[in-house]
Curated annotation (Swiss-Prot):
GO terms for molecular function: glycosyltransferase activity; protein-folding chaperone binding. Keywords: Acetylation, Phosphoprotein. The modification Phosphoserine is found at residues 23, 27, 39, 122, 130, 136, 147-148. Present with 1850 molecules/cell in log phase SD medium. This is IME2-dependent-signaling protein. Residues 25-42, 67-82 have a biased composition (Polar residues). Residues 22-55, 67-92, 117-143 are annotated as: Disordered. One of its GO terms (biological process) is meiotic cell cycle.
Length: 469
């Protein structure tokens, strides 16, 4: 009896070991086990007839029942030699566990991969939920093991495709570094009044910049008393600077101008007299670098290097250098430079046609402090009187005389004092504040001399009118 039990025990041990080995050697993708309904471990009971006797009674094992059914059970579980040969060609229908993995060349061990590989379902088909499908995301095929941070970013992308973790949308336009420069740098000019002549001059300046294919916009500063509606209609950008003009008009009691002095100054007058000071105030946080151009200038060649040159930008650090400008170059009919200080015929000012600066709060505060008057004593009144006698250029020289640098204006910018042939001029910028081709008597005279430089200005104005009509 003992020998029989030992042989049965050995058979059980060998059979169980063989069963475990077979279950672990089976392929993961067994089509016979995809729709099991009964046993959680995948042994379908409806494919086998019930045993005639109970194999387990309580916690004791019924050895006689096991002995009687051992032969049949072995055939059922493992089959005969012929059955085993057939089983090599088709999948076994019995697996103890189904959570082993076939690790191929593309090994993936992230959390989402393991969950997708596991077959988790409830025993009852009515309670099984439909399989969860991953959203279709256009990604390249996996050839390497994904890291956990990549999985986190992928999940965040699914939750919020527009978040910072999902990258830029393919539908959104891409910006190049040049686009940022175009927005942070600009040409600036100032409209002093609403006269037809002033509007014509600004329009010709804007058209000349377009003709030379400048990559930067022209902005026109003006007060609310100046009507710049016509400029906006033709696509020129404008900016009202009343807030900064009022800063100079209304410093308050004990600081700034007295009430009697304020009444003598209008916004238009301050806009004309101190207009260049507003460059330091009105463009802070709007542009990083600006180039002021006189409103009566005509640009004949591309001058974008004034805004793009690293030498120019690096020179202005708002400490040792606050601004760059040109030195005024007056030329006569013989193309000879005229020194305005030594000219006996007429006194020419030294207002530059080009001013390059970086709007900065510290520089603006320096100008504001310069205008601040503490107390109403004689010294304060003298300072008030001095301010009303100074123009913007004089104030800038008093403040930044030792921090003012100049660009080489030889062959760059000229102010002709007489009509000269256009083909003899080799300058990028021509200033027409003396020739004034917009005045009737001057453009009539220019019509009689087609080679005159004034016809460059008049031709551009006529082209604009033809396009507008």
């Amino acid at each position: 009896m003992d020998n029989q039990q030992e042989s049965i025990s050995e058979d059980i041990t060998g059979d169980l070991a063989a069963a475990v080995r077979k279950s672990w050697s089976e392929s993961q993708d067994n089509p016979l086990l995809l729709n099991f309904n009964n046993s959680p471990i995948g042994t379908p009971t409806d494919r086998y007839s019930p045993e005639p006797a109970t194999m387990m009674e309580g916690n004791a094992m019924n050895l006689s029942s096991l002995a009687r059914g051992s032969t049949q059970q072995q055939q059922r579980l493992y089959g005969s030699s012929q059955t085993r040969e057939k089983s090599d060609q088709q999948q076994q229908d019995y697996q103890l566990f189904k959570h082993h993995y076939s690790l191929g060349q593309e090994t993936r061990e992230s959390v989402s991969d393991i969950l997708n590989d596991l077959t988790l379902g409830s025993p009852e088909p009515s309670e099984r939920a439909s399989p969860i499908r991953q959203p279709s995301v256009d990604v390249p095929p996996l050839t390497t093991r994904r890291s956990s941070i990549q999985d986190v970013q992928w999940i965040r992308h699914l939750l919020n495709p527009r978040s910072s973790f999902s990258g830029a949308s393919s539908n959104e336009p891409t910006n190049s570094p040049g686009d940022f420069l175009n927005q942070s740098r600009a040409w600036i000019t100032i409209l002093h009044d609403s006269s037809a002549e002033s509007l014509q001059a600004v329009i010709v300046l804007a058209e000349s910049l377009k003709n030379v294919n400048s990559q930067y916009n022209l902005w026109v500063l003006h007060s609310s008393e100046v009507n710049a509606f016509q400029l906006a209609q033709v696509g020129i950008k404008t900016l009202i600077i009343d807030e900064y003009i009022n800063l100079f008009m209304n410093f308050g009691t004990g600081s700034g101008f007295s009430a009697s002095s304020q009444s003598t100054e209008t916004k238009g007058e301050l806009n004309f007299k101190w207009c260049k000071l507003f460059l330091f105030f009105s463009l802070i946080d709007r542009f990083e670098l600006i180039c002021y151009l006189s409103p009566t200038c005509l640009v004949l060649q591309n001058i974008d290097e004034l805004l793009e040159s690293t030498e120019v930008s690096d020179e202005i650090d708002n400490e040792t250098c606050v601004l760059l400008s040109n030195k005024v170059n007056y030329i006569n009919e013989d193309l000879v430079s005229v020194n305005q200080d030594q000219s006996s015929a007429e006194n020419y000012d030294d207002d530059p046609q080009i001013i390059i600066l970086k709007p900065n709060r510290a520089v603006a505060m320096c100008i504001k402090e310069y205008f601040t008057i503490y107390g109403n004593d004689f010294e304060g009144e003298s300072k008030r009187s001095m301010f009303h006698q100074m123009n913007d250029l004089q104030i800038m020289k008093a403040l930044f005389g030792d921090k003012w640098s100049y660009i080489d204006s030889v062959g760059y910018c000229a102010v002709p004092i007489a009509s000269v042939p256009a083909n003899r001029l080799n300058y990028k910028i021509i200033e027409f504040k003396i020739l004034k081709p917009w005045e009737r008597q001057n453009y009539i005279a220019a019509g009689q001399h087609r080679e005159s430089i004034m016809n460059k200005w008049l031709d551009l104005w006529r082209d604009f009118l033809n396009q507008a009509n």
